[in-house]
């Protein structure tokens, strides 16, 4: 973006001085300020004006490029009408949304491009808190980014349909990466974002400053101006399962971990139980082994096992790296289907953080926790 012209710089800078520093002008009458100080004030005002203009331009560009791929979703469940947000992820009409929007409702209608389309559910996964719907139309798409590149204070943008209003951008920043909430564990690390959300914004895409999707808004924190978003990698894992198998296949190896007394190779995740007749038991992993890595995910504390385990797919062989004494060992374990996937029970005791999930409701009076 080209810099502001000298005349515009002066106008904007003076406007800022008048708006935010009226007392300064009054003080000028009381005591003279050196010309160098006046110049410094002017330059700071100019820099602030240029920075504000640049941010405004960037946000406007992101909204204009991405809003056309963000849609309003209507559905009906056994209690009431559901209204939420979704976004297209391929040019053939496939879209992501939150489980609270597309998971348990039916008779979906998508508002897109000034028209309404019937939609069908492809997949609903309560563990990730996401759902996939599809319409029969050619559609724009959003680019997929990497939530792993975000840090605390990274700026983000959500685009949704709050309170049945037109598409609306909402700007905030990443406040944290949480593995649990109120003592209960998420199935995978969630992004806590300083974004106030309203009814209708569940399923909204969370975008980085490149306009790439890095998360999906799935829940709001009551009595706060914050929300949770599931990382886009979690939704992509579920999508990959669907492409391969037609369903989500959450893997499981059958281990319990707790915090070791001392770190070993940077990890405090100690195997405390190897469940009988499980992939881990058959592989040779033993209690007392210190877990270093599951698949591609590094483990440094017991809670990391939740995030690593989420990305295991049943039927796949997963490399698991451990320390046994002073020996580094690699086990290739073929994961089986997670017991919760068979029983439908997705939330376990807070004392045993084993692949729990909290599909918190957002803007809905109907409890969604199973």
List the predicted regions and their residue ranges.
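C-terminal recognition in membrane/secretory proteostasis and scaffolding
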Residues: 23-39, 61, 96, 114-121, ...
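Bacterial N-terminal signal peptides that target proteins for export
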Residues: 2-12
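Short, conserved catalytic or interaction motifs in soluble domains
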Residues: 161, 179, 204, 276, ...
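Short, glycine-anchored, charge-dense loop/turn motifs used at functional sites
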Residues: 92-94, 209-213, 288
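Bacterial N-terminal signal peptides
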Residues: 13-23
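N-terminal activation segment of mature serine protease catalytic domains
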Residues: 28-88, 94-99, 107, 130, ...
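Active-site region of chymotrypsin-like
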Residues: 69, 76, 131-143, 168-225, ...
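Conserved active-site neighborhood of the chymotrypsin/trypsin-like protease fold
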Residues: 72-83, 88-168, 190, 196-199, ...
């Amino acid at each position: 973006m080209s810099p502001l012209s000298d005349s515009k710089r002066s106008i904007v800078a003076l406007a800022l001085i008048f708006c935010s520093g009226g007392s300064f002008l009054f003080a000028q009458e009381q005591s003279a300020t050196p010309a160098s100080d006046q110049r410094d004030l002017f330059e700071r005002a100019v820099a602030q004006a240029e920075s504000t203009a640049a941010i405004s331009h960037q946000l406007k560009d992101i909204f204009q490029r991405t809003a056309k791929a963000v849609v309003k979703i209507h559905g009906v469940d056994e209690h009431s009408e559901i209204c939420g947000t979704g976004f297209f992820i391929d040019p053939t009409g496939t879209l992501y949304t939150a489980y609270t929007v597309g998971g348990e409702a039916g008779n979906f209608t998508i508002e897109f491009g000034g028209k309404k389309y019937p939609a069908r559910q492809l997949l609903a996964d309560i563990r990730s808190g996401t759902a996939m719907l599809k319409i029969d139309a050619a559609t724009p798409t959003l680019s997929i980014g990497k939530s792993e590149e975000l840090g605390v204070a990274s700026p983000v943008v959500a685009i949704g349909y709050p309170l049945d209003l037109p598409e609306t951008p909402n700007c905030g920043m990443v406040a944290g990466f949480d593995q649990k909430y109120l003592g209960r564990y998420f199935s995978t690390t969630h992004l806590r974002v300083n974004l106030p959300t309203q009814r209708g914004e569940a399923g909204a895409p969370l975008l980085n400053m490149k306009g790439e999707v890095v998360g999906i808004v799935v829940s709001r924190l009551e009595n706060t101006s914050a929300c949770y978003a599931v990382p886009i990698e979690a939704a992509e894992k579920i999508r990959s399962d669907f492409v391969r198998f037609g369903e989500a296949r959450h893997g499981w190896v059958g281990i319990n971990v707790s915090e070791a007394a001392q770190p070993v190779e940077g990890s405090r995740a100690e195997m405390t139980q190897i469940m009988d007749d499980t992939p881990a038991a058959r592989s040779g992993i033993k209690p007392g082994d210190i877990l270093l890595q599951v698949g591609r995910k590094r483990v440094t504390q017991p809670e990391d096992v939740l995030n690593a385990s989420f990305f295991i797919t049943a039927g796949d062989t997963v490399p698991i790296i451990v320390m046994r004494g002073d020996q580094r060992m690699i086990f290739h374990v073929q994961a089986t289907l997670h017991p919760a996937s068979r029983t439908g029970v997705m939330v376990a005791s807070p004392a045993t953080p084993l692949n729990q999930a909290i599909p918190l409701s957002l803007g809905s009076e109907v409890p969604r926790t199973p």
